Amino acid sequence: MSSKATKTVKSKFDIINNQLRDDLIDFRSGDTIRVDVKIKEGYKFRIQSFEGLVIKTQGSGITYSVVVRKMSNGVFVERTFPLHSPIIDSVTLIKRGKVRRSRIYYIRKLSGKAARIKEIMPTKQAKEIK
């Protein structure tokens, strides 16, 4: 491999590493998160929140994305977010859920109380409740 080729590969890695976000929180399927997205309207930007259940996480590095499901006006909406995208302003963890699958597509078929997910409380909160 020539030195020119290795330089271009290194420069590509540098560009990708500069675009990676380091402020992402740790979450997984079953958790409820709020994603704040920048939306351009004319010449201005505004922030729109999308809060829902994480159905799937996928990819690694710059391609890491997440599918979030929420109910809006009686209709369920699923949206895919590439988390290292510049349009993502912030991601906030609302609550942790206990599921045994990494991709919880079965939640689409459930309705009402059957669609609930058991909440996991941090140890401090669990001790305070008891």
Curated annotation (Swiss-Prot):
Give the top-rank taxon of the lineage listed in the UniProt record for this protein. Answer: Bacteria
- Keywords on record: Ribonucleoprotein, Ribosomal protein
Task: Enumerate the PROSITE patterns for this protein.
Answer: RIBOSOMAL_L19 (PS01015)
Coiled-coil spans are none
Q: Which InterPro entries does the entry mention? A: Ribosomal_bL19, Ribosomal_bL19_CS, Ribosomal_bL19_sf, Translation_prot_SH3-like_sf
- What GO molecular function terms would the record report? structural constituent of ribosome
Recorded GO CC terms: cytosolic large ribosomal subunit
Biological process GO annotation list? translation
HAMAP family, per database record: Ribosomal_bL19 (MF_00402)
Q: Identify the NCBIfam families for this entry.
A: rplS_bact
Q: What does this protein do?
A: This protein is located at the 30S-50S ribosomal subunit interface and may play a role in the structure and function of the aminoacyl-tRNA binding site.
Query: What is the similarity comment for this entry?
Result: Belongs to the bacterial ribosomal protein bL19 family.
Q: Name it.
A: Large ribosomal subunit protein bL19
| Lineage per the UniProt record | Bacteria, Bacillati, Mycoplasmatota, Mollicutes, Mycoplasmataceae
Q: Which gene encodes it?
A: rplS
